[in-house]
Amino acid sequence: MSVDYGVIYNRVDRFLQTREGLANPKKASDYKWFVRELSGIFCGAAYEHNLSTESVVNFLDIVQPHCINGIVNTGKVSSVCDLISDHIKHDPLYYILERTLMLYKPASVQVGPGEFFMCFYDAGSVFGIDNTAGYDVVVDGTTTELKSLGTNLTTPEIFDKYAANPILQRLMVVKPVSGAAKPQSRSVYACIDVDKWRDAFYHRNGRTLAYKEGIK
């Protein structure tokens, strides 16, 4: 099935204008690059799965007003898909692009897994594209720092610095769905108030970030 890149490009552009920080004027030189990348992702997914241009546009239409609510903030390992409304999850593009959007880094912006995904699916989000903001994203109305499970780029000392940051409210650690053809589990996360991070996370051997609660 043929895909109309121009139609998808224009719809992606309009979509991104609704997400604060993703069309940040400070990064204006990167913005068109960003739109091209994301348009290419959607065109590729549609082509590979025999979906129409209209299917992509309709998906963006239903995601644009969507808000993420009810993030579990107790440190419990929870399913990311529970944060997404059923009518979106019933669209094949949600699962087709789950891993891609979890790992996607807009243009030249340095972000970690989950940051773009959360802002994509939350109309009220703020993408902390400025590295002096003191947080990665605002999602579900709360300033949030995101990290990836298993990363070796954090330490207890770094997390303690996060806890001392008066702007930052909570810490979220995500494990994106695997790239397997039939993954055994979908993306998960654990989230907790940043000053209680030791109740939910630890650093194996002092560096490798892990959940205290096992993944079921």
Where do the language-model regions lie?
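Nucleic-acid endonuclease domains
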Residues: 2-134, 142, 146-216
